[in-house]
């Protein structure tokens, strides 16, 4: 079965009975603080009230970050990731569909971790839980039965940049540091920060919130995104490092 990176509620509804489709409710609330890391609140309570049938809940902080790491949201080690995927009953050949409630950045972050750790088939539900409900599809309050899998991560080290690679990119014209924070955070004029406002030198600003409609949670069309991308004046030969 082929797959798209973005799927519709109609598509997901038609594939709910497919045992190779594994649905993850990624709802996690990031509450920005004036200084320092955001306060994280689990969305499990929202999940228990009602979720897409068959979905399991995951938390970006507790499940998709390395416990005890020096910095928040550090990509998990292969061993940590293996245990998570085994607990969730996910296999390499499964098609993982992600959705959330309100904050799209949490969902895309989990998409990236799955991708970096070697999962091939990963999609995001366009519009999230809100569009699912608006489209007239049912919710469930039942916890799905899960059979433990035998997962072994294949980490794509080329998808991850450490401090050395990021530092080298500052002066390398073949690399672009792309800042996904809000414009005022990029400029250092407002918003939350980690003790020092501003950005990595020579970064380019493309706020993640420009990628989707803030009201509906749906991604902008390919034509709309192409217009935005052209404004950044990136070259196909350049390597992009996101942060």
Name each region found by the language model.
Residues 1-243:
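Cytosolic catalytic domains that perform sulfur/thiol-centered chemistry
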């Amino acid at each position: 079965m082929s797959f798209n990176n973005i799927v519709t509620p109609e598509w997901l509804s038609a594939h709910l009975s497919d045992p190779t489709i594994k649905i993850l409710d990624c709802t996690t609330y990031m509450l920005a603080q004036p200084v320092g890391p955001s306060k994280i609140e689990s969305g499990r309570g929202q999940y228990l009230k009602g979720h897409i049938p068959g979905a399991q809940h995951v938390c970006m902080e507790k499940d998709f970050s390395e416990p005890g790491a020096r910095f928040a949201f550090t990509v998990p080690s292969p061993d940590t990731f293996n245990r998570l995927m085994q607990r969730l009953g996910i296999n390499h050949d499964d098609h993982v569909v992600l959705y959330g409630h309100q904050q799209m950045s949490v969902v895309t972050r989990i998409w990236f971790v799955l991708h970096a750790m070697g999962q091939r088939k990963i999609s995001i539900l366009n519009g999230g839980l809100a569009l699912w409900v608006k489209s007239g599809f049912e919710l469930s309050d039942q916890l799905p039965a899960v059979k433990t899998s035998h997962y072994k991560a294949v980490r794509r080290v080329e998808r991850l940049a450490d401090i050395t690679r990021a530092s080298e990119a500052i002066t390398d014209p073949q690399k672009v540091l792309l800042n996904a924070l809000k414009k005022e955070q990029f400029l250092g004029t407002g918003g939350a920060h980690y003790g020092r406002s501003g950005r990595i030198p020579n970064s380019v600003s493309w706020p993640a919130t420009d990628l989707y409609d803030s009201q509906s949670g749906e991604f902008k069309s390919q034509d709309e995104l192409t217009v935005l991308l052209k404004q950044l004046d990136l070259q196909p030969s350049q390597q992009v490092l996101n942060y």
